[in-house]
A protein has these predicted regions:
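Amphipathic, non-membrane alpha-helical segments in soluble helical-bundle scaffolds
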Residues: 35, 69, 140, 163, ...
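Active-site acidic catalytic loop and adjacent metal/ATP-binding pocket
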Residues: 48-49, 102-148, 160-161
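ATP-binding pocket architecture of kinase catalytic cores
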Residues: 1-73
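Active-site activation/catalytic loop segments of kinase-like enzymes and analogous catalytic loops
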Residues: 77-86, 146-182, 198-203
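Active-site-adjacent scaffolding segments
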Residues: 9, 65, 69, 76-79, ...
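All-alpha amphipathic helical-bundle segments outside canonical DNA-binding/catalytic cores
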Residues: 64-67, 184-197
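An alpha-helical support segment within catalytic cores of ATP-dependent transferases
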Residues: 53-65, 70-71, 75-115, 181
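Glycan-recognition and catalytic cores of secretory/periplasmic carbohydrate-active enzymes
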Residues: 54-58, 62, 66, 73, ...
Length: 203
């Protein structure tokens, strides 16, 4: 009750990243077992995002408590200075900054009480002997939109997921999300998700 003690378990050494290496190395041709692991994982994501956020003191999140316009602009400027400028592509800097500000406003326009994992990738998911997923490494976690983690997971470049597999996993996530919170229409959900896919791609 004093919050000074906790139970710790050994999850072993099998990560989801290692468990689906065959499909990744085959250029995105995942077998049925690997797809089932991905489905099981993506259906567990809303559990930590919604149920895990209940009662959480956001002020304990480090380095900041909430996904906001400043954090979006920080990442977008990283893209500008580390990719655009070194590439020597010609662009109008003031117009780009204006677009960045509008984009940041769009991304943060819907307020939610969900936990944004921030680094939700296969390397940060461990599997127990029964192939149940356990999520590790919460550094950078904060209050924020649930679309972010879904985009992070399904559009990580190294995974090589096919468009069909992505669509199937988005549908699985959407279905699982209904168990934890009221969900927007499919059209609205997909539209919002596309914004975060673009944002994660720029990162």
């Amino acid at each position: 009750e004093d919050g000074l003690r906790y139970l710790q378990g050994d999850l072993g050494s099998m990560s989801l990243f290692d468990a689906v290496a065959g499909g990744r190395n085959a250029g995105g041709r995942y077998n049925q077992r690997e797809k089932e692991l991905l489905v099981r994982t993506i259906r567990q994501l809303p559990n930590i995002q919604i149920r895990g956020a209940r009662g959480l003191d956001w002020q304990n999140c480090y380095p900041q408590p909430e996904f906001d316009e400043d954090s979006v602009l920080f990442d977008l400027n990283y893209f500008k200075y580390c990719f655009l400028k070194p590439s020597e592509l010609d662009f109008h800097e003031l117009k780009l900054e204006a677009n960045f500000r509008l984009f940041a406003k769009d991304l943060t326009s819907e307020k939610t009480d969900s936990f944004l994992y921030r680094d939700f990738q296969a390397r940060n998911i461990m599997l127990d002997p029964n192939n149940n997923p356990y999520f590790i490494d919460f550094q950078g976690g904060r209050k924020g939109p649930y679309y972010y983690d879904l985009a992070s997971f399904l559009w990580q470049a190294s995974a090589r997921y096919s468009n069909k597999l992505r669509r199937d996993l988005v549908a699985e996530y959407y279905d699982a999300l209904k168990q934890y919170t009221e969900v927007p229409s499919v059209r609205h959900f997909v539209g919002r998700l596309s914004l975060f896919v673009l944002f994660r791609t720029l990162q």
